[in-house]
Amino acid sequence: MRAPRPLARIARYRAPALAICAAAACAATVGCSGGASPGLDWNDEVVKEIEAWRAKHEADYRRDWATIEGLHFLAPGTHTAGSAANNDVVLTGALPARVGRFTVEDDHVAFDPEPGVVLTVNGNAPTPGATLRDDDADDADEIVANGVSIVVHQTGERLALRVRDPNGKRARGFRGFSWFPISREYRVLGRFIRDQVPHEEHVVNTFGDIDTYQSEGVVQFTLNGQILRLRPFTTRPKHLYIVFNDATSGSETYEAARFLTAELRDDGTTILDFNEAYNPPCAFNPFTTCPIPLRQNQLRARVLAGEKKYPERVEPPASAAR
């Protein structure tokens, strides 16, 4: 059985002991005493950078996440797959009637192409029976036929085929993003409070699967006079990935979560710019899998910054059910 990727249930979450005592926390944290945060720039260039970031973010999502047309789960064994109804797995998108056969054994998926069908794997002729690397890796194997791509996707212990069609229904219907006005008060300086020992967080995602992330501490900051903490995941050295929601979730913003990324400085501080808080792709595409915030990342404060909710509600597909 494949090890789960992203917590034992969020309700059971308990933060590990922090590397500093509570009495010293405020003294060691930027912004506890109020006033302007040192080392935090705000000028026309910062505003332009946020505007440029938002434009690039939407363009990236339009090119990538908006093109996902389907997520098709695979049980152990061998399955025919293609667009025709007589396949074991009927794929969405403008694919051939039969693409080939996918064999699931343990935590691997092997692919045998249908004879005579024109397709490539990573731009080359396919090797029958080759094992496909899933999209958790930077070098995932990509099957392409008729301009439509297929990759293996893992969510928790389950494996699926993820189909992308740049000319498909979802790509054509993508409605773009809307944002709160850029605001200086939502760009704050935080201090990273490191745990005594790094650990893994097992996080429930929107499909009910469990994924695993590395966590090394919390970020403490002051927002609108409130001292708050968020626990980021560490996806690479000094890069903080924060999954949170707040008192606007479900009304002004997407109900499940928003994401925020930040870079950790050598002095232990980081800029949290909530003007760049953004929705996960599951806010507009039901065939994506997204983590749910840890309990301590569910803020009672209202964060009126960053991306607003998508203009139409998107429900997870029936195939998401466990």
Residue spans of the language-model regions?
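Extended, aromatic/histidine-rich regions of cofactor-dependent oxidoreductases associated
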Residues: 249-251, 263, 269-271, 275-322
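Forkhead-associated
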Residues: 68, 73-140, 261
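Surface-exposed beta-loop interaction hotspot
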Residues: 144-211
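C-terminal motif of bacterial Sec signal peptides marking the signal peptidase cleavage site
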Residues: 28-31
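Bacterial N-terminal signal peptides that target proteins for export
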Residues: 2-21
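Bacterial signal peptide processing site
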Residues: 33-35
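N-terminal cleavable signal peptides for secretion/export
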Residues: 37-89
